[in-house]
Curated annotation (Swiss-Prot):
It is found in: Secreted. Disulfide bonds join 75-90, 82-95, 89-110. Residues 1-21 form the signal peptide. The keyword ATP-binding does not apply. The presence of a 'disulfide through disulfide knot' structurally defines this protein as a knottin. Belongs to the neurotoxin 14 (magi-1) family. 01 (HNTX-16) subfamily. This is U11-theraphotoxin-Hhn1a.
Amino acid sequence: MNTVRVTFLLVFVLAVSLGQADKDENRMEMQEKAEQGKSYLDFAENLLLQKLEELEAKLLEEDSEESRNSRQKRCIGEGVPCDENDPRCCSGLVCLKPTLHGIWYKSYYCYKK
């Protein structure tokens, strides 16, 4: 009977010690997997951030193109017809009713001040 008890005790001690080792290994594996998961999340976060920055750059580029196209048209040079209500004559020019050569056109032209 003593041999059965000794054998049972030996098996019990081995099972407990090996079980503890497995438990420690499992804990280590879980920590490694958690660290890998964090690195994957960091990688995914960086990738998403990069995509968002590219999208933002494209949107800002489109906005700047719109503002470039919506700016005021170029100024009108000397001797060119202009609108009395919305003169776009270049600096140094004034939108005036013509004298002599343009009287019959009934339009305003850009002239020097």
